[in-house]
Amino acid sequence: MGRRLILDTTVLIAYERETIDRSALDDDELAVASISVAGYRAGIELADTVDRAAERARALTAITSTVDVLDYTEATAAHHGRLLAHVRRSGTARGAHDLIIAAHAAETGRTVLSHDAKARFGDLPGVTFLDARSLATRSS
């Protein structure tokens, strides 16, 4: 078994667009937070064409059928609260959804895989980060 990873929404989008080397994740244990599924579903709802919405829906089904979808539980809330307190004390603004993803990562001992280096997941206590740009396909 390879790495234990949690994919954020940017990676779901890269999966759909085929701009990430999926084979690089073959040996890894993958999960996605339900908040990321919600963010991706918003993209389905906002698609500019019916065909595009259908493509996105198919991609999401393919992803969620092969990875664990993590629900927000009381244990997740405990990690989330700790991270909220940390960012408030440090005065560093963070995305609300990013903190939920980070809470799942801390709770489950997973590394956050994201294209969003600005989210600074690795700066959060108990959270590790892997830059998904290292897994980009050659054409992206």
Region spans (language model):
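Acidic, PIN/NYN-like endoribonuclease modules and their adjacent C-terminal/linker elements
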Residues: 102, 106-140
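Conserved beta-strand scaffold positions in the cores of enzyme catalytic domains, especially
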Residues: 30, 69, 126-129
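Generic structural signal for small/hydrophobic residues in well-ordered secondary structure
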Residues: 8-9, 40, 80, 105
